[in-house]
């Protein structure tokens, strides 16, 4: 039994726009999965369905075999953390450490455990020099790491990262690779939406390719990235990122 499942999921926004149709994904703990596709393919909607920020119009989401139907977003977030593409949509504390520690304290985790999680999160994200800073005084890139650290401190079973490589330099990309591989080695499921094919090739064993609200292909990353016709069909509007030294 897969740990996270989307079974024939559909989602329609109140405006009437249908964002995903018949999406099915099964994922196990320890996997590293990339979700790729052009803008508007349904990637972010699919990710938000995974952690309860959105509820399926039709179909079902299951975590460890249990349907999320009727469960609150906060309950689902204990198991599945979603990190927004834009950190400013997520940060609300005026101190980095307060932001990172908010979720475990909200869930009344004991202080000894909170402190252990904070040390781990800060170490993985390289934020130690900035823990007493106002996150809004940090660069956009570092603010993204603040939100990632907050997710790590929450200690969910599943991490869903939305475009984590956007606006990152080479140092940031290397840091992200280390984080993803460290979490996977601990048995966490890591799902990442990205347009960065180099990052996908270097870090993910499995890739889900989406186009026009559907899944086109779900396979080993090397098979997908070497399928020229699939890349042309699904990623025609995606350009390679510019990496800065």
Enumerate the predicted regions with their spans.
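Helix-to-loop junction immediately C-terminal to a conserved catalytic motif
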Residues: 51
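Conserved beta-strand-loop-alpha-helix hinge in the C-terminal portion
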Residues: 214-234
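H-loop/switch region of ABC-family ATPase nucleotide-binding domains
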Residues: 194-195
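Conserved ABC transporter NBD signature motif
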Residues: 59-67, 76
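Conserved ABC ATPase "signature" region
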Residues: 112-130
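Conserved ABC ATPase signature
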Residues: 134-138
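Catalytic Walker B motif of ABC-type/P-loop ATPase nucleotide-binding domains
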Residues: 159-162
């Amino acid at each position: 039994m897969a740990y996270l499942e989307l079974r024939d999921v559909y989602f329609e926004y109140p405006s009437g726009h249908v964002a995903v149709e018949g999406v099915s994904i099964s994922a196990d703990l320890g996997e590293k999965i990339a979700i790729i596709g052009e803008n508007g393919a349904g990637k972010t909607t699919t990710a938000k369905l995974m952690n309860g920020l959105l509820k399926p119009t039709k179909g079902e989401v299951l975590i460890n075999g249990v349907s999320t139907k009727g469960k609150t977003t906060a309950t689902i977030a204990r198991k599945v953390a979603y990190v927004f593409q834009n950190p400013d949509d997520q940060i609300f504390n005026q101190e980095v450490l307060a932001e990172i520690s908010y979720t475990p304290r909200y869930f009344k985790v004991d202080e000894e455990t909170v402190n252990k999680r904070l040390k781990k999160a800060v170490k993985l994200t390289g934020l130690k020099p900035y823990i007493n800073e106002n996150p809004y005084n940090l660069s956009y890139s570092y603010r993204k790491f603040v939100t990632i650290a907050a997710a790590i401190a929450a200690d969910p079973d599943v991490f869903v990262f939305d475009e984590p490589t956007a606006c990152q330099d080479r140092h940031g990309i290397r840091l992200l690779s280390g984080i993803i591989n460290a979490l996977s080695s601990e048995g966490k499921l890591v799902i990442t939406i990205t347009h960065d094919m180099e990052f996908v090739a270097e870090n993910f064993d499995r890739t889900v390719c989406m186009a026009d609200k559907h899944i086109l292909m779900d396979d080993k990353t090397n098979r997908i990235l070497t399928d020229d016709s699939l890349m042309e069909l699904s990623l025609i509007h995606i350009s390679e990122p510019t990496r800065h030294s």
